[in-house]
Amino acid sequence: MNHHLIITPIFHLQIMLPVATLKRPPPPAATCSIYSFSRGTPSLVSKARLSTAAVGGMKNEPSPNHYSDISSSDLNLTRRSGNYGPTMWDFEYIQSIHNDYTEKKYMNRLNKLKEEMKKMIMAEGSQELEKLELIDNLQRLGVSYHFKHEIMQILSSIKQHSTPADSLYATALKFRLFREYGFHISQEIFGGLSETHTEDTKGMLYLYEASFLATEGESELEKARNWTEKHLREYLENKNDDQNVAELVHHALELPLHWRMLRIEARWFINFYKKKQDMIPLLLELAILDFNIVQAAHIEDLKYVARWWKETCLAENLPFARDRLVENFFWTIGVNFLPQYGYFRRIETKVNALVTTIDDVYDVFGTMDELQCFTHAFQRWNIDELDNLPDNMKMCYFALDNFINEVAGDAFEEHRVPILSYLRNAWTDLCKAYLREAKWYFSKYIPTMEEYMDNAWISISAPVILVHAYFLVANPVNKEVLHYLENYHDIIRWSALILRLANDLGTSSEELKRGDVPKSIQCYMNEKKVSEEEARQHIRLLISETWKKLNEAHNVAAHPFPKMFVKCAMNLARMAQCMYQHGDGHGHGDLNSETTNHIMALLFESIPPA
């Protein structure tokens, strides 16, 4: 299906579909219902959620009395501007999209291909390496979720009967797949194998990819990553005959597979797989058809959240805030693309949209007095705190209050577990973290790295996102897990930290131009008296080290969370790497950005049949 871009005078992005597939139903009426709010039951749980440092400050931070002197009368009441551009995505166009892959005939064909593929996967006589390569292809093509039982059966059999491989490539592939699927495997499997295969480019590539599944203390994998990267870069600098291997090497050095957003990787690998000499036509047809069917499901989710967003009228009434509904939806595909989780994507898109809006209230709109009152309203969940606030800030409060009561009501109906207090606590923590950053801004205070990091992993909003995610994927909701959830288990903390650091690498320059509070790069520069490039290198190292911690948290068999929740936490970190790899992929709304290209490829451009 070919698509052509046309830019309208108001910078809306439109895609011209073939006339036969384009249907334009009248868009639904957008009625602002924001003041028709429900007042939820007050939380019965009251407890300190943030650390003492996050609430009261570190020893070098200005005292609360210092902040109390900052009043509206002391400030220039001219509101700041984030200088955000308008949304590129047209509401009527989104509602008009018709995707043929919703038709039953495509699902029937997919089911037939799946049955044929299962027979191929479980065929007798295949060698161990052939089975591992097939699993790898299934995974990178984005269709392994259809064959979870078969894959686990094969890997379990290999685990029980496997003999040491004499190939660096086979050993590295086995290591990566075992770790990805939760099987214990030691770094000792490589022994001295790696040092003797410097001419094996494919083996070095797969060892390089495997090294990113290391946990803390696995020094041999760290060494392997360093020397394989050196050899792979030298390989690209020299002329080579195998263009497929060169393309894989370039792709890996740009961003390792373990850090990549799954759906973008699937789209890229489908195009790569077409060119392989050993390509399996059945598997290629399955991957393309599955991609297009899943894309059709995502479009229906996007239509739903676009209607919701228009009905809130937040974009019209808060023009200072980023109107990034499609980008907010894109995040949810990265966290959980599976077609059966449409409710997850719809709710998490609302979370993302509200986070973005409230973040901009704190960053570019509110005065110190207003933000204090705004935060108190969220701490007490009491509308009386809103009396002296501008109407658009009241709208934010009502929109969020409506939303979390809706989510809590749905969860209680399904699980008979009251979750309102957990949702409220997570949002309160976020607003308190935003307020602390606002205090730093208004007092022109540059926090230490420790002060900044203590607050920033919460202000990046990952805890809010993942608290909601648990209630959206857990079935049943386990009351014993809620303690780990509300205290932000390491799985949440490390995912949040990667999101924060990746965000800082991609956005700090632009945010400083707007006058925002310093980010980790500037805090480190100020504290250590180093250059910006040295600070950026330090942040990249922190990201790498945090991935090791997240890998460890993922691998610990004793963690209390369902596998799907852990995958969501891992995928949120991957999505951060994707969104901020080439700058601010969330806030800019740039037509030519990588984010726009990714959104086009995942949502609006079907893959033609092979």
Swiss-Prot record:
Question: What's the superkingdom here?
Answer: Eukaryota
How does the record characterize pH dependence?
Optimum pH is 8.
Kindly list the cysteine pairs connected by disulfide bridges: none
Enumerate the catalysed reactions.
(2E)-geranyl diphosphate + H2O = 1,8-cineole + diphosphate; (2E)-geranyl diphosphate = limonene + diphosphate; (2E)-geranyl diphosphate = sabinene + diphosphate; (2E)-geranyl diphosphate = (E)-beta-ocimene + diphosphate
Induction entry:
In petals, transcripts, protein and enzyme activity levels follow a circadian oscillation, with an increase during afternoon to reach a maxima in darkness and exhibit lower levels in the morning, thus leading to a nocturnal emission of floral monoterpenes.
Q: How does activity depend on temperature?
A: Optimum temperature is 35 degrees Celsius.
Question: SUPFAM superfamilies, from UniProt?
Answer: Terpenoid cyclases/Protein prenyltransferases (SSF48239), Terpenoid synthases (SSF48576)
Enzyme class comes to lyase
A Gene Ontology molecular-function term?
A: myrcene synthase activity
What tissue specificity does the UniProt entry give?
Answer: Confined to buds and flowers.
The residues listed in the UniProt record as binding Mg(2+) 2, with positions renumbered to this chain, are: D359, D363
Q: Which GO terms describe its biological process?
A: alpha-pinene biosynthetic process; circadian rhythm; diterpenoid biosynthetic process; green leaf volatile biosynthetic process; limonene biosynthetic process; monoterpene biosynthetic process
**Cofactor(s) for this UniProt protein:** Mg(2+); Mn(2+)
Compartments reported by the entry: Plastid, Chloroplast
Give the metabolic or biological pathway: Secondary metabolite biosynthesis; terpenoid biosynthesis
Q: How many cofactors are bound and how?
A: Binds 3 Mg(2+) or Mn(2+) ions per subunit.
Q: What does this protein do?
A: Monoterpene synthase involved in the biosynthesis of monoterpene natural products of the 'cineole cassette', volatile compounds present in floral scent. Catalyzes the conversion of (2E)-geranyl diphosphate (GPP) into 1,8-cineole and, as minor products, limonene, sabinene, (E)-beta-ocimene, beta-myrcene, alpha-pinene and alpha-terpineol.
PANTHER family found in the cross-reference section: OS04G0344100 PROTEIN-RELATED (PTHR31225), TERPENE SYNTHASE 10 (PTHR31225:SF9)
What family, per the record? Belongs to the terpene synthase family. Tpsb subfamily.
What is the name listed in the Swiss-Prot or TrEMBL entry for this protein? 1,8-cineol synthase, chloroplastic
Species name for this entry? Nicotiana suaveolens
